[in-house]
Structure formats: C-alpha cells, structure tokens
C-alpha cells in the first residue's frame, strides 16, 4: 500500500489517500474512516471491499472538509485509471457541494485536475510501466 496526505488550501480541505490496498491495510483504512465519522454503511462497504481483497474497487468518504480515498488493488493499469479518476471525481463533487460550486462549471474541473496532479506522483506507479 502507498499512503498520501495532502491539503487543498484554497478550500481548507485535507485528503487522506490509500493506493493499491489489500486486506493487510484494513486497520489503517478503517481508522481513517472512523476518525472522519463515517456512517456504518460506508464502514461496512469499505471493510468488505478491503478485507476480501476485491480488485478494481474504490471508496471516497468526506466529512467536515476532510476526505478519505481508498483505491483497491487493480487488475491492470486501465482499471486503476478508471478507479483513480472515478474516486477523484467523488472527492471533487464533495468539495463542490460543500462550497456551492456549480457542478457544470470550470471550477469543478479545476478541482478535479488539481487532485489528479497532486495524486499523480503516487498513482503513476500504477498507471504505466515507465514511471
């Protein structure tokens, strides 16, 4: 597993990201989710996905301007790219909802691009063989 923490100062937001997770990472992931005050249904889904080593799955939970992103192990780079961008989209939508940002406007797209750029140094290992 790879782990990354970063801030988004413009939105006073903190992100905790877990990459390439397996059952061995369950305690760290559950602690992050519980620290954020996640619901029982989200916690159950996360526990099932991670403890059963479900591949090509992800989860994003946000509360109080904090987000936990969990990216499970992928079967190939295409599936990782799908899960990675999918969960980035959820995080960006959570930020947009908190701040009343137009979901059809440029600002949301800049949030998505910014998240992708900050996460790329960690994600690149799973996106291509050359990184």
Where are these regions (language model features)?
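Short helix/strand-bridging catalytic loops that position acidic/His residues to coordinate divalent metals
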Residues: 94-100
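Active-site scaffold of zinc-dependent metalloenzymes
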Residues: 31-78, 91
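Active-site recognition of the HExxH zinc-binding catalytic motif
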Residues: 82-94
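Structural motif
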Residues: 74-75, 100-104
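Generic detector of well-ordered alpha-helical segments enriched in charged/polar residues
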Residues: 27-30, 44, 117-124
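Alpha-helical hydrophobic/aromatic positions enriched in membrane-embedded helices and signal peptides
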Residues: 78-82, 98
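N-terminal low-structure segments adjacent to metalloprotease catalytic domains
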Residues: 1-31, 67-68, 98, 129-131
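Post-HExxH zinc-binding segment in Zn-dependent metallohydrolases
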Residues: 102-131
């Amino acid at each position: 597993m790879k782990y990354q923490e970063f801030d988004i100062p413009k939105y006073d937001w903190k992100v905790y990201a877990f990459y390439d997770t397996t059952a061995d990472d369950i305690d760290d992931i559950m602690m992050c989710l519980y620290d954020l005050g996640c619901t029982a249904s989200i916690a159950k889904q996360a526990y099932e996905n991670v403890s059963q080593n479900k591949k090509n799955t992800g989860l994003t939970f946000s509360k109080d301007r904090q987000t936990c992103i969990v990216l499970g192990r992928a079967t190939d780079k295409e599936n990782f790219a799908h899960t990675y961008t999918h969960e980035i989209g959820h995080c960006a939508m959570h930020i947009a909802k908190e701040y009343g940002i137009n979901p059809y406007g440029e600002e949301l797209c800049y949030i998505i691009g910014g998240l992708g750029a900050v996460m790329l140094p960690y994600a690149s290992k799973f996106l291509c063989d050359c990184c």
